[in-house]
UniProtKB/Swiss-Prot annotation:
Signal peptide: none annotated. Pathway: Cell wall biogenesis; peptidoglycan biosynthesis. This is UDP-N-acetylmuramoylalanine--D-glutamate ligase. Cell wall formation. Catalyzes the addition of glutamate to the nucleotide precursor UDP-N-acetylmuramoyl-L-alanine (UMA). It comes from Campylobacter jejuni (strain RM1221). It is an enzyme of class 6 (ligase). It catalyses: UDP-N-acetyl-alpha-D-muramoyl-L-alanine + D-glutamate + ATP = UDP-N-acetyl-alpha-D-muramoyl-L-alanyl-D-glutamate + ADP + phosphate + H(+). Pfam families: Mur_ligase_M. It comes from the Bacteria. GO terms for cellular component: cytoplasm.
Protein backbone atom coordinates (compact mmCIF):
# COMPACT_ATOMS: atom_id res chain seq x y z
CA UNK A 1 0.00 0.00 0.00
CA UNK A 2 1.44 3.37 -1.01
CA UNK A 3 0.49 6.19 1.36
CA UNK A 4 1.05 9.80 0.36
CA UNK A 5 1.31 12.51 3.01
CA UNK A 6 0.47 16.11 2.12
CA UNK A 7 2.45 18.72 4.05
CA UNK A 8 5.44 18.17 6.31
CA UNK A 9 3.73 19.14 9.54
CA UNK A 10 3.44 17.66 13.00
CA UNK A 11 0.65 15.23 12.05
CA UNK A 12 2.23 13.82 8.90
CA UNK A 13 5.72 13.63 10.41
CA UNK A 14 4.30 11.60 13.31
CA UNK A 15 2.68 9.16 10.88
CA UNK A 16 5.88 8.80 8.86
CA UNK A 17 8.04 8.31 11.95
CA UNK A 18 5.79 5.93 13.89
CA UNK A 19 4.38 3.73 11.13
CA UNK A 20 7.39 3.21 8.87
CA UNK A 21 7.84 -0.35 10.18
CA UNK A 22 4.23 -1.23 9.36
CA UNK A 23 3.83 0.45 5.99
CA UNK A 24 7.38 0.95 4.77
CA UNK A 25 8.38 4.32 3.41
CA UNK A 26 5.92 7.15 2.77
CA UNK A 27 5.84 9.71 -0.01
CA UNK A 28 5.70 13.15 1.60
CA UNK A 29 4.77 16.15 -0.54
CA UNK A 30 5.40 19.73 0.51
CA UNK A 31 5.79 23.02 -1.35
CA UNK A 32 9.09 23.58 0.47
CA UNK A 33 10.66 20.51 -1.14
CA UNK A 34 12.32 21.72 -4.34
CA UNK A 35 14.07 18.48 -5.25
CA UNK A 36 13.46 14.85 -4.33
CA UNK A 37 15.30 13.65 -1.23
CA UNK A 38 15.02 10.97 1.42
CA UNK A 39 14.79 11.53 5.15
CA UNK A 40 16.63 9.39 7.70
CA UNK A 41 13.82 6.81 7.69
CA UNK A 42 13.82 6.38 3.95
CA UNK A 43 10.68 8.43 3.26
CA UNK A 44 10.67 10.30 -0.03
CA UNK A 45 10.39 14.09 0.26
CA UNK A 46 8.78 15.31 -2.94
CA UNK A 47 7.58 18.47 -4.62
CA UNK A 48 3.79 18.53 -5.23
CA UNK A 49 4.40 18.59 -8.98
CA UNK A 50 5.68 15.01 -8.68
CA UNK A 51 2.41 13.60 -7.30
CA UNK A 52 0.76 10.91 -9.44
CA UNK A 53 -2.66 9.94 -8.11
CA UNK A 54 -2.48 6.64 -10.00
CA UNK A 55 0.46 5.57 -7.84
CA UNK A 56 -1.13 6.45 -4.48
CA UNK A 57 -3.58 4.32 -2.47
CA UNK A 58 -4.27 6.76 0.38
CA UNK A 59 -3.62 10.48 0.75
CA UNK A 60 -3.47 12.04 4.24
CA UNK A 61 -3.16 15.84 4.53
CA UNK A 62 -1.83 17.83 7.44
CA UNK A 63 -4.99 19.23 9.11
CA UNK A 64 -4.45 22.80 7.93
CA UNK A 65 -3.49 21.86 4.37
CA UNK A 66 -5.40 24.25 2.05
CA UNK A 67 -8.42 22.59 0.39
CA UNK A 68 -7.76 24.46 -2.86
CA UNK A 69 -4.19 23.15 -3.13
CA UNK A 70 -3.52 21.21 -6.32
CA UNK A 71 -2.63 18.10 -4.30
CA UNK A 72 -6.09 18.05 -2.72
CA UNK A 73 -7.69 18.59 -6.10
CA UNK A 74 -5.77 15.65 -7.61
CA UNK A 75 -6.20 13.22 -4.70
CA UNK A 76 -8.51 10.25 -5.27
CA UNK A 77 -8.34 8.57 -1.84
CA UNK A 78 -8.18 11.48 0.59
CA UNK A 79 -8.74 10.88 4.30
CA UNK A 80 -7.91 12.62 7.56
CA UNK A 81 -5.68 11.19 10.27
CA UNK A 82 -8.92 10.54 12.22
CA UNK A 83 -10.19 8.32 9.40
CA UNK A 84 -6.81 6.63 9.03
CA UNK A 85 -6.67 5.62 12.70
CA UNK A 86 -10.41 5.07 13.20
CA UNK A 87 -10.21 1.28 13.07
CA UNK A 88 -7.87 1.23 16.09
CA UNK A 89 -9.33 4.27 17.87
CA UNK A 90 -10.72 3.45 21.33
CA UNK A 91 -13.77 5.19 22.75
CA UNK A 92 -13.34 8.89 22.01
CA UNK A 93 -14.53 12.35 22.93
CA UNK A 94 -14.08 15.06 20.33
CA UNK A 95 -14.11 18.69 21.43
CA UNK A 96 -14.54 21.50 18.92
CA UNK A 97 -15.80 25.07 18.62
CA UNK A 98 -14.12 28.38 17.87
CA UNK A 99 -12.68 29.23 21.29
CA UNK A 100 -11.97 27.13 24.35
CA UNK A 101 -11.20 23.84 22.59
CA UNK A 102 -7.75 23.45 24.11
CA UNK A 103 -8.77 24.43 27.63
CA UNK A 104 -11.84 22.17 27.60
CA UNK A 105 -9.79 19.26 26.26
CA UNK A 106 -7.16 19.77 28.94
CA UNK A 107 -9.75 20.11 31.71
CA UNK A 108 -11.64 17.00 30.59
CA UNK A 109 -8.41 15.00 30.48
CA UNK A 110 -7.53 16.31 33.93
CA UNK A 111 -10.87 15.00 35.20
CA UNK A 112 -10.68 11.64 33.43
CA UNK A 113 -7.01 10.66 33.36
CA UNK A 114 -7.58 8.33 36.32
CA UNK A 115 -9.72 6.09 34.10
CA UNK A 116 -7.14 5.97 31.33
CA UNK A 117 -8.01 9.05 29.29
CA UNK A 118 -5.28 10.56 27.11
CA UNK A 119 -5.31 13.82 25.18
CA UNK A 120 -4.39 14.45 21.57
CA UNK A 121 -5.45 15.79 18.22
CA UNK A 122 -5.05 19.52 17.66
CA UNK A 123 -3.40 19.88 21.06
CA UNK A 124 -0.35 18.01 22.25
CA UNK A 125 -0.04 14.56 20.72
CA UNK A 126 -0.80 13.53 17.11
CA UNK A 127 -2.99 10.44 16.79
CA UNK A 128 -0.04 8.44 15.43
CA UNK A 129 1.61 8.78 18.85
CA UNK A 130 -1.43 7.95 20.99
CA UNK A 131 -1.73 4.51 22.55
CA UNK A 132 -4.73 2.68 20.99
CA UNK A 133 -4.96 0.49 24.10
CA UNK A 134 -5.84 3.42 26.35
CA UNK A 135 -9.49 3.45 27.40
CA UNK A 136 -10.37 6.91 26.12
CA UNK A 137 -8.99 9.41 23.64
CA UNK A 138 -10.00 13.03 24.26
CA UNK A 139 -9.29 14.88 21.04
CA UNK A 140 -9.23 18.61 20.41
CA UNK A 141 -10.68 18.66 16.93
CA UNK A 142 -10.23 21.55 14.51
CA UNK A 143 -12.49 22.54 11.65
CA UNK A 144 -9.62 21.62 9.32
CA UNK A 145 -9.59 18.03 10.57
CA UNK A 146 -13.38 17.80 10.40
CA UNK A 147 -13.31 19.06 6.81
CA UNK A 148 -11.19 16.09 5.75
CA UNK A 149 -12.92 13.49 7.97
CA UNK A 150 -15.63 11.36 6.33
CA UNK A 151 -15.65 8.07 8.24
CA UNK A 152 -14.57 8.50 11.86
CA UNK A 153 -16.91 9.60 14.65
CA UNK A 154 -16.74 9.99 18.43
CA UNK A 155 -18.99 8.59 21.14
CA UNK A 156 -19.26 12.11 22.57
CA UNK A 157 -19.02 15.30 20.52
CA UNK A 158 -18.77 18.48 22.61
CA UNK A 159 -19.21 21.63 20.54
CA UNK A 160 -18.43 25.02 22.03
CA UNK A 161 -19.92 28.19 20.47
CA UNK A 162 -19.01 28.97 16.87
CA UNK A 163 -18.06 32.42 15.58
CA UNK A 164 -16.31 33.54 12.35
CA UNK A 165 -12.76 32.19 11.99
CA UNK A 166 -10.51 30.73 9.29
CA UNK A 167 -12.83 32.11 6.60
CA UNK A 168 -10.06 32.43 4.01
CA UNK A 169 -9.45 28.67 4.44
CA UNK A 170 -13.09 27.52 4.48
CA UNK A 171 -14.36 30.05 1.96
CA UNK A 172 -17.31 31.27 4.04
CA UNK A 173 -18.75 31.22 7.54
CA UNK A 174 -21.43 28.79 6.42
CA UNK A 175 -18.77 26.36 5.17
CA UNK A 176 -16.94 26.73 8.49
CA UNK A 177 -20.11 25.91 10.45
CA UNK A 178 -20.97 22.98 8.21
CA UNK A 179 -17.52 21.47 8.76
CA UNK A 180 -18.01 21.81 12.52
CA UNK A 181 -21.38 20.03 12.29
CA UNK A 182 -20.41 17.43 9.68
CA UNK A 183 -19.59 14.70 12.20
CA UNK A 184 -23.19 14.64 13.47
CA UNK A 185 -24.44 12.81 10.39
CA UNK A 186 -22.17 9.85 11.22
CA UNK A 187 -23.09 9.53 14.89
CA UNK A 188 -25.64 6.94 16.04
CA UNK A 189 -28.25 6.42 18.76
CA UNK A 190 -25.68 5.40 21.36
CA UNK A 191 -23.69 8.61 20.92
CA UNK A 192 -24.14 11.99 22.61
CA UNK A 193 -23.54 15.48 21.30
CA UNK A 194 -23.53 18.68 23.36
CA UNK A 195 -23.95 21.72 21.15
CA UNK A 196 -25.21 25.32 21.11
CA UNK A 197 -29.00 25.63 20.93
CA UNK A 198 -28.84 27.33 17.54
CA UNK A 199 -27.73 24.01 16.04
CA UNK A 200 -30.16 21.80 17.97
CA UNK A 201 -32.09 20.85 14.83
CA UNK A 202 -29.06 19.55 12.95
CA UNK A 203 -29.94 16.09 11.56
CA UNK A 204 -28.30 13.32 13.60
CA UNK A 205 -29.14 10.02 15.23
CA UNK A 206 -27.13 11.01 18.31
CA UNK A 207 -28.77 12.14 21.53
CA UNK A 208 -28.62 15.95 21.46
CA UNK A 209 -28.13 18.09 24.56
CA UNK A 210 -28.31 21.74 23.53
CA UNK A 211 -27.45 24.81 25.59
CA UNK A 212 -27.93 28.57 25.37
CA UNK A 213 -25.12 29.68 27.70
CA UNK A 214 -23.07 28.63 30.73
CA UNK A 215 -26.03 28.75 33.08
CA UNK A 216 -28.20 26.67 30.77
CA UNK A 217 -25.52 24.03 30.22
CA UNK A 218 -24.87 23.80 33.95
CA UNK A 219 -28.58 23.30 34.61
CA UNK A 220 -28.79 20.50 32.03
CA UNK A 221 -26.18 18.51 34.01
CA UNK A 222 -27.12 19.65 37.55
CA UNK A 223 -23.78 21.44 37.86
CA UNK A 224 -23.42 23.91 40.74
CA UNK A 225 -21.62 26.90 39.22
CA UNK A 226 -20.82 28.27 42.67
CA UNK A 227 -18.48 25.32 43.20
CA UNK A 228 -16.39 26.18 40.13
CA UNK A 229 -13.44 28.52 40.72
CA UNK A 230 -12.98 29.48 37.04
CA UNK A 231 -14.59 32.64 35.71
CA UNK A 232 -15.51 33.75 32.20
CA UNK A 233 -14.22 33.15 29.57
CA UNK A 234 -13.09 29.83 31.05
CA UNK A 235 -16.33 29.08 32.90
CA UNK A 236 -18.03 27.48 29.89
CA UNK A 237 -14.94 25.32 29.28
CA UNK A 238 -15.05 24.10 32.87
CA UNK A 239 -18.78 23.33 32.73
CA UNK A 240 -18.34 21.46 29.45
CA UNK A 241 -15.53 19.36 30.95
CA UNK A 242 -17.75 18.49 33.92
CA UNK A 243 -20.61 17.64 31.55
CA UNK A 244 -18.36 15.17 29.73
CA UNK A 245 -17.39 13.62 33.07
CA UNK A 246 -21.06 13.41 34.05
CA UNK A 247 -21.96 11.55 30.85
CA UNK A 248 -19.14 9.05 31.22
CA UNK A 249 -18.99 8.51 34.99
CA UNK A 250 -22.09 10.17 36.46
CA UNK A 251 -19.81 12.15 38.78
CA UNK A 252 -18.92 15.83 39.18
CA UNK A 253 -15.39 16.33 40.54
CA UNK A 254 -15.38 20.02 41.45
CA UNK A 255 -12.29 19.86 43.64
CA UNK A 256 -10.29 18.05 40.98
CA UNK A 257 -11.44 20.53 38.33
CA UNK A 258 -10.44 23.50 40.46
CA UNK A 259 -6.93 22.09 40.80
CA UNK A 260 -6.43 22.46 37.04
CA UNK A 261 -3.73 25.00 36.12
CA UNK A 262 -4.33 27.16 33.06
CA UNK A 263 -1.82 27.07 30.22
CA UNK A 264 0.21 30.07 29.13
CA UNK A 265 -0.87 32.48 26.38
CA UNK A 266 -4.53 32.69 27.42
CA UNK A 267 -5.27 35.73 29.58
CA UNK A 268 -1.88 35.23 31.23
CA UNK A 269 -1.37 38.13 33.63
CA UNK A 270 2.07 39.62 34.34
CA UNK A 271 3.28 42.76 36.09
CA UNK A 272 6.04 45.07 34.90
CA UNK A 273 8.67 46.79 37.05
CA UNK A 274 6.18 49.58 37.81
CA UNK A 275 3.54 47.09 39.02
CA UNK A 276 1.34 47.70 35.98
CA UNK A 277 -0.84 44.90 34.60
CA UNK A 278 -0.07 43.35 31.20
CA UNK A 279 -2.07 40.43 29.80
CA UNK A 280 -0.74 37.92 27.28
CA UNK A 281 -3.77 36.69 25.35
CA UNK A 282 -1.88 35.92 22.15
CA UNK A 283 -4.04 32.85 21.52
CA UNK A 284 -7.06 35.13 20.96
CA UNK A 285 -6.99 34.95 17.16
CA UNK A 286 -10.65 35.72 16.46
CA UNK A 287 -13.22 38.31 17.46
CA UNK A 288 -15.16 36.23 19.99
CA UNK A 289 -11.98 35.47 21.95
CA UNK A 290 -11.14 39.17 22.05
CA UNK A 291 -14.68 40.05 23.15
CA UNK A 292 -14.34 37.59 26.03
CA UNK A 293 -11.03 39.17 27.05
CA UNK A 294 -12.47 42.68 26.89
CA UNK A 295 -15.42 41.65 29.06
CA UNK A 296 -13.02 40.27 31.64
CA UNK A 297 -11.37 43.69 32.05
CA UNK A 298 -14.38 45.90 31.32
CA UNK A 299 -14.01 47.78 34.62
CA UNK A 300 -10.57 49.10 33.61
CA UNK A 301 -9.24 51.29 30.85
CA UNK A 302 -7.85 48.89 28.23
CA UNK A 303 -4.82 49.39 26.00
CA UNK A 304 -5.38 46.76 23.32
CA UNK A 305 -2.75 45.43 20.91
CA UNK A 306 -4.57 44.21 17.81
CA UNK A 307 -3.60 42.99 14.35
CA UNK A 308 -1.69 40.35 12.41
CA UNK A 309 -3.08 38.00 9.77
CA UNK A 310 -6.84 38.57 9.89
CA UNK A 311 -7.53 35.37 7.89
CA UNK A 312 -10.02 37.19 5.68
CA UNK A 313 -12.48 37.83 8.51
CA UNK A 314 -14.50 41.05 8.69
CA UNK A 315 -13.85 42.49 12.17
CA UNK A 316 -16.39 45.33 11.97
CA UNK A 317 -18.57 43.76 14.68
CA UNK A 318 -15.60 43.59 17.05
CA UNK A 319 -14.83 47.28 16.60
CA UNK A 320 -18.49 48.17 17.11
CA UNK A 321 -18.38 46.08 20.29
CA UNK A 322 -15.36 48.07 21.49
CA UNK A 323 -17.39 51.29 21.49
CA UNK A 324 -18.75 50.27 24.89
CA UNK A 325 -15.29 50.26 26.49
CA UNK A 326 -12.75 52.78 27.70
CA UNK A 327 -10.15 51.63 25.19
CA UNK A 328 -7.18 52.68 23.06
CA UNK A 329 -5.83 50.53 20.24
CA UNK A 330 -2.31 49.75 19.07
CA UNK A 331 -2.25 48.25 15.57
CA UNK A 332 0.40 45.74 14.51
CA UNK A 333 1.15 43.27 11.75
CA UNK A 334 0.27 42.98 8.10
CA UNK A 335 -3.24 44.23 8.86
CA UNK A 336 -2.07 47.45 10.57
CA UNK A 337 -3.72 49.79 8.05
CA UNK A 338 -6.91 47.74 8.07
CA UNK A 339 -7.06 47.91 11.89
CA UNK A 340 -6.55 51.68 11.76
CA UNK A 341 -9.37 51.97 9.22
CA UNK A 342 -11.70 49.91 11.43
CA UNK A 343 -10.80 52.12 14.39
CA UNK A 344 -11.44 55.32 12.44
CA UNK A 345 -14.89 54.14 11.33
CA UNK A 346 -15.73 53.21 14.94
CA UNK A 347 -14.33 56.51 16.24
CA UNK A 348 -11.78 54.72 18.43
CA UNK A 349 -8.34 56.13 19.22
CA UNK A 350 -5.61 54.03 17.62
CA UNK A 351 -1.83 54.14 17.25
CA UNK A 352 0.07 52.87 14.22
CA UNK A 353 2.75 50.57 15.63
CA UNK A 354 3.22 47.82 13.01
CA UNK A 355 5.51 45.71 15.22
CA UNK A 356 4.87 44.30 18.69
CA UNK A 357 7.88 45.86 20.41
CA UNK A 358 6.82 49.34 19.31
CA UNK A 359 3.27 48.69 20.55
CA UNK A 360 4.54 47.67 23.99
CA UNK A 361 6.76 50.75 24.21
CA UNK A 362 3.93 53.03 23.08
CA UNK A 363 1.57 51.56 25.66
CA UNK A 364 4.19 51.98 28.37
CA UNK A 365 4.11 55.73 27.71
CA UNK A 366 0.39 55.85 28.54
CA UNK A 367 -0.37 52.96 30.90
CA UNK A 368 -1.35 53.72 34.50
CA UNK A 369 -1.38 51.32 37.45
CA UNK A 370 -5.17 50.99 37.51
CA UNK A 371 -5.36 50.19 33.77
CA UNK A 372 -4.57 47.09 31.72
CA UNK A 373 -2.41 46.44 28.65
CA UNK A 374 -3.87 43.58 26.66
CA UNK A 375 -2.37 41.59 23.79
CA UNK A 376 -5.52 40.06 22.33
CA UNK A 377 -4.89 40.52 18.62
CA UNK A 378 -7.96 38.95 16.93
CA UNK A 379 -5.57 37.74 14.23
CA UNK A 380 -3.19 34.89 13.51
CA UNK A 381 0.52 35.44 14.09
CA UNK A 382 2.22 33.92 11.04
CA UNK A 383 2.71 37.25 9.26
CA UNK A 384 5.46 38.16 11.75
CA UNK A 385 5.99 35.13 14.02
CA UNK A 386 6.38 31.37 13.78
CA UNK A 387 3.40 30.80 16.08
CA UNK A 388 1.03 32.49 18.51
CA UNK A 389 3.26 31.13 21.29
CA UNK A 390 6.30 32.95 19.90
CA UNK A 391 4.24 36.14 19.71
CA UNK A 392 3.34 35.73 23.37
CA UNK A 393 6.97 35.04 24.28
CA UNK A 394 8.16 38.19 22.50
CA UNK A 395 5.40 40.19 24.19
CA UNK A 396 6.50 39.07 27.65
CA UNK A 397 10.15 39.73 26.82
CA UNK A 398 9.28 43.28 25.77
CA UNK A 399 7.29 43.86 28.96
CA UNK A 400 10.13 42.53 31.10
CA UNK A 401 12.50 45.08 29.54
CA UNK A 402 10.39 48.01 30.72
Amino acid sequence: MKISLFGYGKTTRAIAENLVDKFGSFDIYDDHFVETKKDTLGNLLLNPNDFDNNLSDIEIPSPGFPPKHKLIQKAKNLQSEYDFFYDIMPKSVWISGTNGKTTTTQMATHLLSHIGAVMGGNVGTPLAELNPYEKLWILETSSFTLHYTHKAKPEIYALLPISPDHLSWHGSFDNYVQDKLSVLKRMNECDVTILPKIYANTPTKAHIISYKDEKDLAAKFSIDMEKISFKSPFLLDAIMALAIEKILLDTLSYELLNSFVMEKNKLEEIKDSQNRLWVNDTKATNESAVMAALNRYKDKKIHLIIGGDDKGVDLSNLFDFMKGFDIELYAIGISTEKMLDYAKKANLKAYKCEVLSKAVNEISNHLRVNEVALLSPACASLDQFNSYAERGKVFKECVNKI
